[in-house]
Amino acid sequence: MKNNNDIKFIYEKLSSLYPNYSNKKPKAKIYSKAYTSLIGVMLSAQSQDKRTAVACRQLFALADSPEDMINLSQEEIIEAIRPAGLFNAKSKNILATSKMLLEEFDGRVPNTQKELMSLPGVGRKSSDIVMRFVFGEPHIAVDTHVFRMLWRLGWADS
C-alpha cells in the first residue's frame, strides 16, 4: 500500500485537471424509476452501452415494472434483450428478480447493498451503481479495470 502522501498527491493532480468535479450526491437517475434503473444495470453487464440502450428500450416498451415484467414469458424477454448479449441468463435473472421484488420487497427496489446483492443477477458492482445513481449514496463501482489500476499504483492488494 502506498502512503497517504502519494494518495494526496494524486488527488491534488486530479483535482487540478478536473476543477468542476463535484462529490455531491447525483440528482439524475439512470432511468425514471428505480426498477428500470436496476434492470438497466443488470442488462449492462458485459455489454456495450449502445447495445444495452437498445435492449432497455425494447424491454421497457413491453414492461417497466416488476408487475408487468412477470407477465412476460422468458422468450419475450429474450427477444427484447437479445442485443445486450447473455440473454438466457439475463432473462432468467430479470424474471427471478422481478418476482423477488414483489414477494419480498413489496415491489420496491431495496435501498441497501446487502438486500440488492440478494437479488438474482446483482453483484457488488451492480449494487454499487444502483446505490450511487438511484439512491445517491456515496458508493464507487470498481470493475476489473479500476482494480487493476489501483493495484498497479499499490493502493490495492490482490
What are these regions (language model features)?
Residues 2-158:
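Catalytic cores of DNA base-excision repair glycosylases
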